């Protein structure tokens, strides 16, 4: 179980605010946490993550996961990640981790949003392509992994925890 959260709006987070947001997700992932801020059309895209190591406990698998100009925060497990990894290797992709997170970001890089149809498992993730200025927020077909969101005016917030959304907005 991991924790993910994101914010798109005009607010920037200082170090204390980042820690407070990450603290709300600590129980979901005590092994590591991460934060990334990306400027997006005069707004800020802030990605928060708390990690519970399951498949790959190497620090290279920490999140937000970055590949080229793409970013991913992911909670869940892709059961067929080895099959997808093999297909992607045949397309010329190389891998630095054993993580299904790396497989997911490269699957989305190669297949785009159609890569979601290839996934077998349980997940909630946010993928952002900074070149295309396009984001994908996805949840597995059965809703096994939690996902909550808030949208009003120029702010969009999502998280695997409701209390995290509240902390981001305050």
Where are these regions (language model features)?
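Cysteine-centered catalytic environments shared across enzyme families
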Residues: 1-170
């Amino acid at each position: 179980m991991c924790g993910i959260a994101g914010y798109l709006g005009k607010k920037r987070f200082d170090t204390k605010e980042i820690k407070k947001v990450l603290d709300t997700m600590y129980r979901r992932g005590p092994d590591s946490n991460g934060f990334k801020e990306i400027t997006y059309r005069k707004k800020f895209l802030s990605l928060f993550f708390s990690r519970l190591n399951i498949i790959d406990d190497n620090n290279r698998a920490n999140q937000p996961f970055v590949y080229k100009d793409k970013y991913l925060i992911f909670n869940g497990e892709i059961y067929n990640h080895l099959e997808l990894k093999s297909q992607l290797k045949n397309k010329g992709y190389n891998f630095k981790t054993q993580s299904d997170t790396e497989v997911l970001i490269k699957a989305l890089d190669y297949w785009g949003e159609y890569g979601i149809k290839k996934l077998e498992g349980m997940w909630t993730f946010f993928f952002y392509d900074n070149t295309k200025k396009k984001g994908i927020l996805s949840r597995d077909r059965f809703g096994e992994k939690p996902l909550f969101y808030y949208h009003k005016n120029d702010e969009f917030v999502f998280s695997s925890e409701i209390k995290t959304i509240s902390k981001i907005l305050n």
